[in-house]
């Protein structure tokens, strides 16, 4: 599937995310992600020992499971944390999918390289898989194809009618390219107008998880299409009213700082605007699925995985964000991020994608669909997770119908 990139977007404050990374910048430093075998994971839970040295005199985590304790001593593990947190009412479903088997091992062995720690854990009895964690980055916003204002004006003047009254729809040539702009080719677009003509403008029954930077939930062109957790909205502050393991997640959750505090992000707001800016409300731009009556279309859930306010060592758990979205009825996961992966497939994210594909959509849809950007490096190869078989990967097309120079 191909899409077009445009310089027209909804703008929030400009922020970026940073992480503590390995020397090559591709992996998160000081932590190895492991999947335990079922027997070992159950023994770990049964032991009920603290999986952190914080507040103790211990120099490394002691789990009560001999093979894990041995490798913990070697790498000087200071904590083990579940990748997919306790899920309250959804915990049984998570366990059935094996999500409770995943742990992050944080270590502090002096001079130990990340690959060395991974290999030690990989060879440990009871560890089914061990990997480094890729540093995922948002895709888009930096590279785009320029179209001059004069050319856009010429095209707008030539257009006799438009389906909606949003003032910047004229500028969204990537929705309906009629070839009037010099250097463009008629039909080299995303076929959005044709979809709208068939009545497909965005249903309120469809929940789209924006797994990206947080978006501006009170933006005048987005607010009518924001997903709302009514149990938390009408509940008691500071209480997990719906007993799902998350507190006060009214519009979604911030997986960078593990909080319901959503921070508007330029990339996330841009993506949300493309997906679901309200159509026919006389404001701003149109969203692909923003409805048709000025009252909204699809509902968009905030699953924040980029936030510059966090410390440099804070790393969002992308897989946990995908699982969160599935458990709350999202049928589409919009993911404009990824990473070049060498020898470490992020199987925790693969597990999350599999879970979303099977369980997304709640009781209104038969499963879910994850949509990933193919990447903007202008390269061939496996750009993860867009290279997975179960997802739809979307590249960029130039306005003349050719592959954009920067698209993977």
Per-segment meaning from a language model:
Residues 1-15:
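Bacterial Sec-dependent N-terminal signal peptides
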Residues 13-155:
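Inhibitory N-terminal propeptides of secreted protease zymogens
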Residues 32-35, 79-82, 103-106, 129-131, ...:
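Structural recognition of the beta-strand scaffold that forms the well-ordered cores
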Residues 36, 40-50, 112-116, 217-224, ...:
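Short, solvent-exposed loop/turn elements at domain surfaces
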Residues 89-104, 122-207, 215-221:
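Protease zymogen maturation seam
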Residues 123-126, 221, 225, 284, ...:
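Glycine-centered tight turns that cap/initiate beta-strands
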Residues 125-128, 185-259, 270-274, 278, ...:
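Acidic-leg catalytic submotif of subtilisin-like serine proteases
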Residues 190, 197-198, 202-204, 213, ...:
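Substrate-binding/access-modulating region of protease and related hydrolase catalytic domains
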């Amino acid at each position: 599937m191909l899409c077009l990139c445009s310089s027209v977007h909804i703008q929030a404050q400009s922020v970026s995310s940073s992480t503590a990374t390995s020397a090559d910048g591709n992996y998160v430093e000081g932590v190895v992600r492991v999947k335990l075998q079922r027997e070992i994971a159950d023994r770990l839970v049964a032991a009920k020992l603290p999986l952190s040295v914080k507040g103790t005199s211990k120099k490394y985590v002691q789990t009560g499971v001999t093979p894990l304790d041995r490798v913990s001593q070697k790498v000087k593990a200071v904590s083990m944390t579940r990748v997919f947190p306790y899920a309250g009412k959804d915990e049984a479903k998570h366990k059935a999918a094996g999500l409770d088997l995943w742990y992050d091992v944080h270590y502090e062995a002096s001079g130990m390289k990340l690959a060395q720690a991974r290999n030690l854990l990989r060879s440990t009895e009871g560890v089914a898989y061990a990997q480094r964690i890729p540093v995922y980055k948002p895709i888009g916003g930096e590279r785009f194809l320029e179209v001059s204002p004069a050319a856009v004006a010429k095209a707008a003047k030539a257009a006799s009618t438009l389906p909606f009254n949003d003032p910047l729809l004229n500028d969204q040539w990537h929705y309906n390219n009629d070839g009037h702009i010099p250097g463009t080719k008629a039909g080299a677009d995303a076929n959005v107008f044709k979809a709208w003509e068939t009545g497909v403008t965005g249903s309120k029954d469809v929940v789209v998880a924006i797994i990206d930077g947080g978006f501006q939930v009170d933006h005048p062109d987005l607010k009518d299409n924001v997903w709302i957790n009514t149990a938390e909205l009408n509940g008691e502050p500071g209480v997990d009213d719906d007993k799902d393991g998350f507190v006060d997640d009214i519009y979604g959750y911030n997986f960078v700082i593990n909080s319901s505090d959503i921070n508007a992000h330029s990339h996330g707001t841009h993506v949300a605007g493309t997906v679901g800016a309200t159509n026919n409300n006389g404001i701003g731009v149109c969203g692909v699925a923003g409805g048709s009556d000025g009252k909204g279309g699809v509902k968009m859930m905030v699953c924040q995985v980029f936030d510059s306010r966090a410390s440099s060592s804070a790393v969002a758990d992308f897989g946990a964000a995908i699982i969160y979205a599935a458990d709350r009825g999202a049928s589409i996961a919009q993911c404009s991020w990824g990473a070049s992966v060498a020898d470490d497939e992020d199987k925790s994210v693969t597990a999350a994608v599999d879970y979303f594909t099977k369980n997304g959509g709640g009781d209104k849809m038969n499963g879910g669909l994850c949509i990933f950007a193919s990447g903007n490096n202008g390269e061939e190869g496996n750009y993860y997770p867009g290279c997975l078989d179960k997802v739809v990967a979307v590249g960029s097309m130039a306005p003349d119908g050719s592959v954009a120079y920067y698209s993977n």
